[in-house]
Amino acid sequence: MTTTLQQRESASLWEQFCQWITSTNNRLYIGWFGVIMIPTLLTATTCFIIAFIAAPPVDIDGIREPVAGSLLYGNNIISGAVVPSSNAIGLHFYPIWEAASLDEWLYNGGPYQLVIFHFLLGVFCYLGRQWELSFRLGMRPWICVAYSAPVSAATAVFLIYPIGQGSFSDGMPLGISGTFNFMFVFQAEHNILMHPFHMLGVAGVFGGSLFSAMHGSLVTSSLVRETTEIESQNYGYKFGQEEETYNIVAAHGYFGRLIFQYASFNNSRSLHFFLGAWPVIGIWFTAMGVSTMAFNLNGFNFNQSILDSQGRVIGTWADVLNRAGIGMEVMHERNAHNFPLDLASGEQAPVALIAPAING
């Protein structure tokens, strides 16, 4: 009899836990995805803060030339970063127990892998948690679909790109200047500015910002005046009412006269779908572009594509971009035996082996 009571009590505790996890009445919804999301994001955040402040230099290139990224080693908020794991580690999974000592793990950039793996798992679970909460509230699932855009972008730069390049040392450093360095090197090696998917991503991000500002200003400018209890609702709206609190017809008429009639939406659902879909699709394309360039399917090459009647090159902005990329790549490849292939495999240039005579 005692055993039966204990089993019922344990089952009751489990049921209470399940109800608490999946309850939509909590101040913050946890959900089953949250059971994984909370510890992984806490781990990633804690390790990032500690590494950003106090991590020792990391041998990122695998040539015994450590790069310091933490605040205690002379960096500031702008220049500091969690340096990616060493090129000597490559794509190997490198947890703490795989290193001979903690010093070796830190020297080879182990904290970077710890942060990005827990971070990616955490944001994946955050996406699943958005779907889970929408499902339990009877909502449509488009919130998590929109969130998949930044998730795919983070996955591209932290996971897909290092896999394609063969080493986690090619991943994006976790810092402001490190992000800029990643962008410069990416342009130098893959010519991302000439890739159509990157162009679509730029249109998505900047276009989404423009449309968001336009929409917010139009709605704010066409709000219906709030009424009191002694006034008719025909003069405005009542706080908490279910109907829209702004006049979309007025906003549509204003914008249609400002540009032209068919440049504005007179349907609220179409308008908000457009506002959501435009930046999301653009960022999806950017993530796909980074993922394809990870395997060296690079941007277009229009270098020296315009010649005059005598075969001489007429410089274009594509040539300027190419020369800038070559310069950035030379500065990036500090290792002499890893000279950029697109420079080492060019046409032979005549070299003067004897100093010319100077007739004074």
From Swiss-Prot:
A quinone binds at residues 215, 264-265. Coiled coil: none annotated. One of its GO terms (cellular component) is plasma membrane-derived thylakoid membrane. InterPro entries: D1/D2, Photo_II_D1/D2_sf, Photo_RC_L/M, Photo_RC_L/M_CS, PSII_D1. The record marks 344-345 as: Cleavage. [CaMn4O5] cluster binds at residues 170, 189, 332-333, 342, 344. It is a multi-pass membrane protein. Tyr-161 forms a radical intermediate that is referred to as redox-active TyrZ, YZ or Y-Z. Pfam families: Photo_RC (PF00124). Residues 345-360 form a propeptide. It is found in: Cellular thylakoid membrane. Belongs to the reaction center PufL/M/PsbA/D family. This is Photosystem II protein D1. It comes from Microcystis aeruginosa (strain NIES-843 / IAM M-2473).
